[in-house]
């Protein structure tokens, strides 16, 4: 992880951590990088989109100023899911894609994600290079372009339809007579998800689809599925689908209001693909956070689980290295490599409903054979500086090491820093529910005591 980039772009509280100055410097640095790497291109184009946060306008303006001053041309495609930016970037043969979003984070935060010309997130090496440019702007700005050589910003919001139509075409047939509740988190999916499911003739109820700039992810979406659960039961819907702020995550709800996490959705999709002969190598990639019960389910169905570090970029790296077509995270990031270059919540939800339709089984029935082992996850708030050095604390590390030795055959312990928020995440799992929960609480209390 670099000085500015985390596991998913640059992120922080808008106007305090992710400032106008930082966005402007990123615009200069990215523009310089693109110019240097495309010396024979007269007109270098990038695609830019955003979620619904009020601070997106501010950051867009700063990024635009930096990029256009370096001669870059920007097509702004408006409010669109993050994977929509990745898709349009590749289709339009742009040199980069930029998404202004803090994903599932609170409305006060914002972030900037960058994709390369193929629609993949930037490598660590390229991010490091851009960070170097951000810290050495004197050299970059020493010879500014002449006034008639600068780039240009234009609205290209009709390009949204290219992405929307692509999603619709990913489904064979339609979803007639399937009753679905969508929770679009007052975010980037508020238009796309509704449009696609209506195109496919689903019977829809849509909630949290009235963004005002400040209500994104507020008690709604994939991180707060409680209301969705109640609405699904109340409307007697077949299922509910919840996205996060930039719609790269999906969490589902069955007809009884039970929440279905990303791992279980991956399990359902993977088995559906295996039965159709499209699960290449019969392998799935998830992360170290995946429940051992999920791993057992895959094994029973002759599917091998490969684990990657947390973060969809690391999942994708392993998928590419091992030639795997489906992977993702418990949190709902799901990558379907035959269809997309990054996690796409709307695409994943379409494929989930397709499995339900084709098997004739409801979501509750499909998920019932995935039995979770007891697992406890506790998030401990820690400021970003202490978060990055938590594992240097001898008292904390000694306690974790001793617990690992004592309970190595009974409990799996995983403690890690969040790549996107000021949190240390403590996860424990095993067969003894009380022991699993107590260990997680003991570790979390110790971290709280030592670091706060």
Curated annotation (Swiss-Prot):
Task: Cite the GO molecular-function annotations of the record.
Answer: magnesium ion binding; phosphoglucosamine mutase activity; phosphomannomutase activity
* Post-translational events: Activated by phosphorylation.
Against NCBIfam families, the record matches this protein to: glmM, PRK10887.1
Cross-referenced Gene3D superfamilies, in alphabetical order? Alpha-D-Glucose-1,6-Bisphosphate, subunit A, domain 3, Alpha-D-phosphohexomutase, C-terminal domain
Q: Which cofactor does it need?
A: Mg(2+)
The record's similarity note reads: Belongs to the phosphohexose mutase family.
Cofactor annotation comment: Binds 1 Mg(2+) ion per subunit.
Q: What does this protein do?
A: Catalyzes the conversion of glucosamine-6-phosphate to glucosamine-1-phosphate.
Key words of the record: Isomerase, Magnesium, Metal-binding, Phosphoprotein
Provide a GO CC annotation, any one: cytosol
Q: Which HAMAP family match?
A: GlmM_B
InterPro entries according to UniProt: A-D-PHexomutase_a/b/a-I, A-D-PHexomutase_a/b/a-I/II/III, A-D-PHexomutase_a/b/a-II, A-D-PHexomutase_a/b/a-III, A-D-PHexomutase_C, A-D-PHexomutase_C_sf, A-D-PHexomutase_CS, Alpha-D-phosphohexomutase_SF
Protein's recorded name = Phosphoglucosamine mutase
Positions with a binding annotation for Mg(2+)? 103, 244, 246, 248
Q: What is its EC number?
A: 5.4.2.10
Identify which residues the record assigns to the active site: 103
Q: Which reaction does it catalyse?
A: alpha-D-glucosamine 1-phosphate = D-glucosamine 6-phosphate
Q: Which residues carry this modification: Phosphoserine?
A: 103
């Amino acid at each position: 992880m670099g000085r500015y980039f985390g596991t998913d772009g640059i992120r922080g509280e808008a106007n305090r951590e992710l400032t106008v100055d930082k966005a402007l410097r990123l615009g200069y640095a990215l523009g310089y990088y693109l110019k240097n790497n495309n010396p024979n291109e007269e007109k270098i184009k990038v695609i830019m989109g955003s979620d619904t946060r009020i601070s997106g306008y501010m950051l867009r303006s700063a990024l635009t100023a930096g990029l256009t001053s370096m001669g870059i041309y920007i097509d702004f495609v408006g409010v669109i899911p993050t994977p929509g930016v990745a898709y349009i970037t590749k289709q339009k043969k742009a040199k980069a894609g930029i998404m202004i979003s803090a994903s599932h984070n609170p409305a006060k935060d914002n972030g900037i994600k960058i994709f390369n010309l193929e629609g993949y997130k930037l490598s660590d090496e390229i991010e490091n290079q851009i960070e170097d440019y951000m810290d050495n702007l004197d050299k970059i700005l020493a010879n500014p372009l002449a006034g008639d050589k600068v780039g240009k910003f234009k609205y290209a919001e009709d390009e949204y339809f290219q992405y929307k139509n692509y999603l619709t075409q990913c489904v064979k047939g339609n979803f007639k007579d399937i009753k679905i509740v969508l929770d679009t988190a007052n975010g980037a999916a508020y238009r796309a998800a509704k449009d696609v499911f209506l195109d496919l003739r689903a019977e829809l109820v849509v909630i949290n689809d009235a963004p005002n700039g400040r209500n994104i992810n507020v008690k709604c979406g994939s991180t707060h599925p409680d209301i969705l659960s109640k609405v699904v039961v109340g409307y007697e819907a077949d299922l509910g689908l919840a996205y996060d702020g930039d719609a790269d995550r999906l969490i589902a709800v069955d007809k009884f209001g039970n929440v279905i996490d990303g791992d279980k959705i991956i399990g359902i999709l993977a088995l559906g693909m295996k039965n159709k002969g499209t699960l290449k190598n019969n392998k799935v990639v998830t992360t170290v956070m995946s429940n051992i019960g999920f791993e057992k389910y895959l094994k029973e169905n002759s599917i091998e689980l490969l684990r990657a570090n947390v973060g969809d970029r690391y999942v994708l790296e392993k998928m590419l290295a091992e030639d795997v077509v489906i992977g993702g995270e418990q949190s709902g990031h799901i990558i379907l490599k035959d269809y997309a270059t990054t996690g796409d919540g709307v695409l994943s939800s379409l494929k989930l409903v397709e499995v339900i339709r084709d098997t004739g089984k409801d979501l509750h029935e499909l998920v019932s054979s995935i039995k979770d082992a007891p697992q406890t996850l506790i998030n401990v708030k820690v400021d970003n500086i202490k978060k990055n050095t938590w594992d240097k604390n001898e008292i904390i590390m000694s306690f974790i090491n001793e617990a690992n030795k004592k309970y190595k055959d009974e409990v799996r312990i995983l403690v890690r820093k969040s790549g996107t928020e000021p949190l240390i995440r403590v996860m424990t799992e095993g067969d003894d529910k009380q022991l699993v929960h107590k260990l997680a609480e003991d570790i979390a209390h110790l971290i709280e005591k030592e670091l706060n």
